[in-house]
Amino acid sequence: MKPHRMTGFATRKANDPHHLDEDGFPFDQVTEDALTFVREHDDRPFFLYYATWLVHTPIHTRSKALLDKYVKKLGVELPDDPRAKWMGEGQTNPFYCAMVEQLDYYIGRLVDHLEQTDDPRWPGHKLIENTYVIFTSDNGGMEGSRTQIITDNHPLDRGKISLMEGGTRVPLIITGPGIAKGVESDVMVNGLDFYPTILSLAGAMRPRDKLFDGCDLAPLLRQDPTNPNLVREADGRVRDTMIWHFPNSAALESTIRIGDYKLVRNYDHLNNPNNRELELYRLYNSEGDRPARMDIEEQKNLADSMPGKARSMNRRLTEALTEMKASYPYYNPHGHRSPDTKTHVCTVLSHRQTGDSVKFTYRENGAEVVRANLIYTLNGGARYEEWYRTPAKIVPGNKAVAKLPKGTTHYFLNLIDENNFLRSYPEILNQKNPSKAQVKY
């Protein structure tokens, strides 16, 4: 909404692209497209992936009435300057609340259509009776940014861009034929399970040449949604383990959940008093008939009192990440909290390009260079540059050589040493447009 989120509210004018409907909600193109798709395909089996923009940033609403409703309900006041920061703590952001209600309304329209529409392939029945609905999210709520507090995932810790429970524990509702109603479950599942589950529920053949990372949840859903023994790996073993790997952005962590316990491995722990290398939490106690909630808030770190448990889970995490050839975060030689070995980072002395071949010469300063990658783009200077990685070869004489892929417009070299420091050449000054580096090619 331009110039700011206190402008551009929807009206009832016919030529308003966001015009209000009979219930006073703004027009939503994604919802209309979803309804159109169902209407055009309800005479045959269909799959609809309804990925709404709500409640993603930017946090705003086209409904002035909803905004006013939540300003009053929350007892807050909008700032005189519409561009001012919104730093009200907790769940007190009226813009976000309005977005949540809009989301509820739009999903309701889709469900209402399924409930009210006859199934052309099943006379006497409605579409909803032959449709599975899965409602979930790709991550926990975004709690805030530098300019505003959006929401609070209390009692869970943190939110989006984190592997703490506030970032990974998300809503999940599954309904459809053969699934018991109103059953709450603490069984551990994730989004990777949806593909094999949908194939199973639809009676579709599983591709023989595909290795599924997720499990088929159909037995769990159809028999007893509270029984974790019904979630099994391809080899028949009960699944009791999941991992999450977020080595970049603000997270810089990996986690593993085994049964009741969750281990958090923080990569940004050296010279950082705010982070422990390992954190261990017992989320549940499954010793009884049903799992009992223990510490999903992740407030009691057991790493010191259960060091053996922490070590064994950390080894298991390493094994899993090694199997999938996971990447890890590197140290920045310019970082003020980087280890002292940053003084041993190599220095790139020169580079030379001949046709599509490029050679870099470097000097080691106490740490061996163990890996090199060429980072390149085919559309340098475009509004949205897309960059790729390809291995460079380390050869005798402290040199790295690589072949430029056809169409390369810009490139740079990454050298990684034995202490996990990364040296880029040339230095990247503009992270949004890496082609604007110190050296032009």
Q: Where are the regions a protein language model picked out?
A:
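Active-site rim elements
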Residues: P17-G24, W86-C97, G159-I161, G178-M188, ...
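Active-site regions of oxyanion-processing enzymes, predominantly non-cytosolic
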Residues: F27-G75, T117, P123-I134, E165, ...
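Formylglycine-dependent
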Residues: M1-T61, D81-C97, A180, R276-L278
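Histidine-centered active-site microenvironments of extracellular/periplasmic hydrolases
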Residues: P58-S63, H113-I179, V189-N190, H269
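C-terminal cap/loop subdomain of S1 sulfatases and analogous C-terminal strand-loop tails that border
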Residues: G141-L163, A180, V187, L192-D289, ...
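Long, internal low-complexity/basic segments
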Residues: A292-R371, I375-N379, P391-H410, N414-Y441
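A long, amphipathic alpha-helix that forms part
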Residues: T31-V38, L74-T131
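Core domains of carbohydrate- and sulfate-ester-processing enzymes
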Residues: M1-K13, Y50-T52, H56-D81, G144-V170
